[in-house]
């Protein structure tokens, strides 16, 4: 067919190749889409004939550009690409020899070149952009069909232009095959193809890719068979039918047409009709136009050509006038034609678009109106094939509309009426079919859940009047589940609201017909709760729930929680706390398990009046305590601390109540994770003095399995929410056998581990709501999921400030978050939990220790505080949530100031003494609230007193920052002090309060102290504080966000934040000053300060901060393992905190918990609880396990950048215990905390009660130590002092000189420790002395203090700091006590010299500083003992830590061990883990 020589083939031969018109047709069709050259068939034919390399090369380059989707292929560089594609497509895919292997394209035979060109057209249709470029084209319109055939079987082909080809079927298969293939390809009637549709190709048009390929494959097979042997001219190859050009001139067209005129066969008559009517007239016009075109073309090209060739200038000049005229005229005509064409095309396109949109709208209307039937079909996945396309189009239109709206542009009419005009309501119309389908699926799921409920049987079928007389007379709109299912099946529910309304109607009918007290009504209530749960589960992202529904659900949940709390003994408080006033009113009586405190809290939460709060809380605490003790029976007949916490919580509704009250599910229980119920471990441990004897062991033992305990666990969380007191309880509870025994394997973090809180996202703490600035999630995000109470604890602090709002927020706390957050703190703080390990006598002995359980010192004060600062007690717990006491201390001192420093706090401390009796367990503490028996009481009281003394300033606006902090809780309770209230939100009392509160909260330290604490922190915190508590909280959160544990950060309450931050800073400084962990530690105010700011930060929160520092050390392990210093045990701890963050409230708290292996008891609460989340280096309870140095806690980096990014680098496991600050209770809790610390912090002082004296930096040990000791005493005795000490310690770590002094001054200035002592009725000095002497400074010796503060070892210093920070929680001091007692070995070293630099965590033994031997011996002592039992190493103690009194977390730690606190203490001294034992509280 093609001459073998590369020369030009004869025209006749060329015209016999159908590929030539096919190529020309392809280029004509897709010229615009594929950017192909514009030419006619004749031009291509001429170029091939002349062997026009330029023309052919340009065409090939354009085709290859499309095939390879690149624009750098030119006529000069196309050869390599051509060879590549032919090699792949032609040779590999089709198996034909690659002709380009032996010769270049130009050297190939013409026939082969034509075939290659034709194949390139096919390949171009396989490119990636074809779909997009041709999506608007119809395949049928592109396909070339024969015009017809005659009797002989010859086919007549028209491609385009003015040519018609004839294919004779004569020779061969080629022809026959071709014709067959064409026909098979869809050869249609000649009439089916408009005259100009086709191109020149006669065969299978290139139009359709598949057809083309079929044709080509056939052709090429023929060619391969015939081309080699054949050297034919013409189209008469052996296997090729003859193709030849039938006609191209007007005359030829007429002749061919006439030749069919007389034909008789149907085919030929049809062909004639088509040619004569459709083609001939058009072809004649085209030919006429074509005749003019060449002249025009010449005219156009001539001038150009001439301009290119100057040699022709003369000719050009001659022709110029004529050519110019012709050219202008021609161009004008062409332009007019083009404009007309464009206008026509545009109109056509617009018309098509309109029709398409109209069609879509009609379909949409049909779809919506026919939804009933369609929905049923949807459920069977039997959608019509066109629906997905329609939906895709509708979605695209919606997106386009949304984009235009977002740009503020006007919507075209077609986009402004996307919704079908149907009689349906607008809401129905807005739903897309997709959404409706999803809603239907969800409705079916909800209905299935409801039907499967055990109480659904009365509602499954329509009511029969045979057993329900006159039913249909009373009920006008009957409804039942089967009827709803029928409606659903029938597609009658167009919106979720209709479905919900029917369900509500059913429940309403039941209530209306059966009455309120009917069994059926109760069943309907159960079913309704089930329904709401299912709705929330299956309609997750919906914000369609009305406020009414939300509150109904909240009420139901609260009711549920109440009943659960009743069972657990004190878990109801949280539920009650949910609403500021409602919580008290509902939960107050019975829910609390007979705690009047909830009411107190409610009163404060309602924000009725601070003063009332301050007075009320004490009273309530007393009552509540009494009741609480009753309630605590869970614990084995002793008042449950959880109840007490609850009581306290009422005082601080936002802090505790709301959290707890917010959502039964919110707490651990809510999350679905086994939650420690308030009645459980904590409650078991709750009884202060009583409990140690009765509850300690029994609690310990039963804790895991006791239902109460479980409730306690939940309650704990709630308790934590309750504030320092509950927090402590919680810690204890958690620390002991896990409240949900099964929930946390004893091996993990049973006792203090609060991980159970995992169950739910932390709802924003009740107290948080008030401080909207600090989203609950920020506060407790970190552990939020773990504890669900994280925020609550901090919120306790925060809540204190947000007491009123908290009430309602409690509901928001639906998630475990808010409610549980305090509880989490509680866990960590739960001195009781920690305390239980201490022998009953020890507990008594450590009034301060148990007292935290007894509201008198810590909790007491909180109640007092509650009275004065409704939230104060809880706030303190909140701040100390993280570390238990520290939180409270923080609150009292900084955030804690509001508690301790305010008159209310003082009153509370006094009340604490009184409350102690109500909280019988605390009676030792209670009488001498400030100076409970033993150092602990002293510490606790001094802390309390300190806070209280300054607290006297509670009403002390002058003390606005501190006071405000302190009052914050109060505000939450009753009135929002501007600063306070602000603080609650900003500081979030939970979070900001700590951070800010730390600086701000210590009334004694006052803002000055806070600010003095650390210029940096103050800079951040101060401003935040100043600007607004809410802001502060948020900032804290933000800062925290920087921390590895943002969530933790979120969780930690102000106290937690502050404490944590301090701790973190301490830990950072002490341990590694890890990458600004300290800075992080002070996310609140000095997040960016880095390590250096750690000291400042600490200063910032002398009390709270110090606490925080201590806690961070602890929390660090748990909370900041990953980001913070892995070397710090924190690695594990860190991991663990975010998840677990037992201190939920204070992720930092969790970090604190984790911070030190020792803190594991606490840490576990935080991290331990979420062992999974925070695998933590320390296995279950073994912070040590991760603790690179038992003494070093990984700094606690709140996942969310807690206010206090306290990332004590290597705080030993104690730091977890440092969480002891968790013990938010002023004295009792403080004492508890103290034990907690020894337990949790080998370093000595638990994070919960890191006394400011405890310098954050080791290097500061000497100075800070002495000073710290004093400060610690002061802090213990007075929150202000604590703050000062805390500040000092941090400063010591960084700038010991000025800042420390400043801090000290400011702390003392606002309210000197003496003041606190006096206020406490426990003479701060006496208490301090007792505390120091007994425990040789809670954290041991001044040196330890220094180390603690400086976090030299970063483990206990935070502890120490925490102790200081948590004066409200003397227990923090007990941390050191614990150390001494819990770890007799560490006690020796810790008590005397915090220098604990020897401690594993590198901190001076903080335990000693606070180690009121008596107090410390209590709770923490037990922990320490356990640790000693486990004393095989830090790990042992850590583990012990984790398994607080009753916890079996560490086999090593035996319950007996706790009683042997002294031994444990010793152990702790040698091993920082001794502090970790402090954590046991947390570890439930």
Curated annotation (Swiss-Prot):
Biased-composition ranges, Pro residues, are 1243-1254, 1474-1484
Asymmetric dimethylarginine PTM sites in chain numbering: 1197, 1203
Xref: InterPro entries: Bromodomain (IPR001487), Bromodomain-like_sf (IPR036427), Bromodomain_CS (IPR018359), CECR2 (IPR029614)
Task: Tell me the residues on which Phosphothreonine occurs.
Answer: 546
Instruction: Specify residue ranges for compositional bias: Basic and acidic residues.
Output: 210-222, 1304-1320
Which spans does this entry mark as compositional bias, Polar residues?
A: 223-234, 1451-1469
Tell me which GO cellular component terms the UniProt record holds.
CERF complex; euchromatin; nucleus
The keyword Phosphoprotein appears for this protein? yes
Q: Where do the segments described as Disordered lie? A: 170-241, 556-704, 796-825, 919-1053, 1165-1259, 1287-1320, 1442-1484
Q: What is its main location?
A: nucleus
Give all residue intervals belonging to the Bromo domain: 434-538
| Subcellular location(s) of the protein | Nucleus
* Positions with biased composition (Low complexity): 605-614
Function field: Regulatory subunit of the ATP-dependent CERF-1 and CERF-5 ISWI chromatin remodeling complexes, which form ordered nucleosome arrays on chromatin and facilitate access to DNA during DNA-templated processes such as DNA replication, transcription, and repair. The complexes do not have the ability to slide mononucleosomes to the center of a DNA template. The CERF-1 ISWI chromatin remodeling complex has a lower ATP hydrolysis rate than the CERF-5 ISWI chromatin remodeling complex.
Query: Domain notes, please?
Result: The Bromo domain recognizes and binds acetylated histones. Also recognizes and binds histones that are butyrylated.
Q: What is this protein called?
A: Chromatin remodeling regulator CECR2
